[in-house]
Amino acid sequence: MAVRGSGTLTPFSIQAILNKKEERGGLATPEGRPAPGGTEVAVTAAPAVCCWRIFGETEAGALGGAEDSLLASPARTRTAVGQSAESPGGWDSDSALSEENEGRRRCADVPGASGTGRARVTLGLDQPGCELHAAKDLEEEAPVRSDSEMSASVSGDHSPRGEDDSVSPGGARVPGLRGAAGSGASGGQAGGVEEEEEPAAPKPRKKRSRAAFSHAQVFELERRFNHQRYLSGPERADLAASLKLTETQVKIWFQNRRYKTKRRQMAADLLASAPAAKKVAVKVLVRDDQRQYLPGEVLRPPSLLPLQPSYYYPYYCLPGWALSTCAAAAGTQ
């Protein structure tokens, strides 16, 4: 059975509502016996009035009979209302009729209302009050709005929402899914841009091929360079036209030639500034494949050898036996 909990509704069956309507439309009481006088009209008219919002229409005949019965005998109507409100048949939790009856009981319990007014509220003739309570129930059951939505509504954010915004059960739009989808799409686009940028790496510059000058062109350029190291614009253009070269080729050739000349000049200056080597008399050891020294002279190394720099004694190509003799003499010392 469906029971109304705190702020929640248990689902019900439409077929159960239709069955209840047919049973109550058969002029029979919930207990299966006729009610006291005047009650049958009120109980029979109640289901049609209670279900007017569910089925979209009301039975005009039942409403008319209810109004006539109310106008004819208010006392019997009050008795019927009290009996229907207190009896288990008027409070059925198996269908939405129980919710309607509960709402109308709330409307009927408003202080200051007369018995006739209570009967009219119970039968659905006074509908604005019941609709107000129903609206309050819907507001209580609706999900609470989040802080972000409240701040957006307060700040007056009227930005248009896309059709793909999801709708929550309470009717509130949830833009989170769209934002996630947008971020995912932007992440996908960013990933695609990065993939496109990776193969677009800067290509290594192609090595420029050197211009091949003929011997006649080089000879003429050398002759002009020895005569004039710097050329003006018209002179460069005239020389390039005479040699069938471009002005850029002539300009670069003169630049390279000036740099080459400068390096040669610096090397010559460095050699000129170096100290001159001293000339030392050296005894000839071998001449015409004949030894010019005694065996004991080679064993005595010169006394000034450790004190003098090595560049004073140039290297001589000695025969193998002389080198072995020098090594043996060094080992004995």
From Swiss-Prot:
The keyword Acetylation does not apply. Residues 74-121, 137-212 are annotated as: Disordered. Expressed widely in mesoderm at the gastroduodenal junction (at protein level). Expressed in visceral mesoderm and embryonic skeleton. Expression is restricted to immature proliferative chondrocytes during endochondral ossification. GO terms for cellular component: nucleoplasm. Residues 179-191 have a biased composition (Gly residues). Keywords: DNA-binding, Homeobox, Nucleus, Repressor, Transcription, Transcription regulation. This is Homeobox protein Nkx-3.2.
